From Swiss-Prot:
One of its GO terms (biological process) is cell projection organization. The gene is Twf2. SUPFAM superfamilies: Actin depolymerizing proteins. The lineage of its organism: Eukaryota, Metazoa, Chordata, Craniata, Vertebrata. Phosphorylated on both serine/threonine and tyrosine. Keywords: Acetylation, Actin-binding, Cell projection, Cilium biogenesis/degradation, Cytoplasm, Cytoskeleton, Developmental protein, Phosphoprotein, Repeat. Its main location: cytoplasm. Interacts with G-actin; ADP-actin form and capping protein (CP). Isoform 2 interacts (via its N-terminal ADF-H domain) with G-actin (ADP-bound form) with significantly higher affinity than isoform 1. May also be able to interact with TWF1 and phosphoinositides, PI(4,5)P2. When bound to PI(4,5)P2, it is down-regulated. Interacts with MYO7A. Actin-binding protein involved in motile and morphological processes. Inhibits actin polymerization, likely by sequestering G-actin. By capping the barbed ends of filaments, it also regulates motility. Seems to play an important role in clathrin-mediated endocytosis and distribution of endocytic organelles. May play a role in regulating the mature length of the middle and short rows of stereocilia. Belongs to the actin-binding proteins ADF family. Twinfilin subfamily. This is Twinfilin-2. Residues 322-349 are annotated as: Disordered.
Amino acid sequence: MAHQTGIHATEELKEFFAKARAGSIRLIKVIIEDEQLVLGASQEPVGRWDQDYDRAVLPLLDAQEPCYLLFRLDSQNAQGFEWLFLAWSPDNSPVRLKMLYAATRATVKKEFGGGHIKDELFGTVKDDLSLAGYQKHLSSCAAPAPLTSAERELQQIRINEVKTEISVESKHQTLQGLAFPLQPEAQRALQQLKQKTVNYIQLKLDLERETIELVHTEPTNVAQLPSRIPRDAARYHFFLYKHTHEGDALESVVFIYSMPGYKCSIKERMLYSSCKSRLLDSVEQDFQLEIAKKIEIGDGAELTAEFLYDEVHPKQHAFKQAFAKPKGPGGKRGHKRLIRGPGENGEDS
């Protein structure tokens, strides 16, 4: 769930979106300026979409400034032309800008119209968002993907897990995934997290040894958390999130599974996904660590302070509290109205 920043499109940009959706525009560049989404640049089609792609997209990717690009394909769906949504966040741009653009990404798609967007890409270097990068993305998403013998074996393991007979004894063990053992250093780190002598743990899979290894336990605060997320490798993270909620000081353990998409091999994606549930079971049962929230991300810039708070304390909780003492309607009817408990099935008289 993407955190919303309160930034919205200007009326001029909304009008341009409407014009572009009709098919007269090949590319739209959107930037954040004065806390608003504004039109940065646009281009009309010259040739086929694949002929226009690199010459339209690549020159608009600034080495220092993030941006959003909407690129029109030649294919159509029921709503009209299909578009690619490209999120550009270069390595050299300031962390504050990266976080702002990551948190506003969902708003841009909503303002443009999510039904028009066929696919989306995220890039930190130009190769990520080039035509070759897009084709690589399509290849990685294609099903069935080409598998090595080891990957086919892993796939068969997962299929067999699905087919496991569900009985009273086995139903809680079905689909629990692969269990790579935690190395001693990783176990010690989890014990330290339970004792609150460390506040951050990063773990990785050793694919050759089939173990879960400790990467580091560097002290980390919320502001530093995005920088802990590798851009080119998957990781498991445990973070002791210290914050205040409704006047109470809390320390909540948050699990973060970071997977930077197609930058990882199919085997790596499958193994990290398959090992995750068994790792969490071990952490909660063997180490008696209560995990307040489990989050999956593709980019560290998503981990803003507000995003973490909203994940641990979803806003719907506030609505429940608001309805705890509803105001009765005016007039005599207000004195007769009852709020029934969850076990009562009577009807209003």
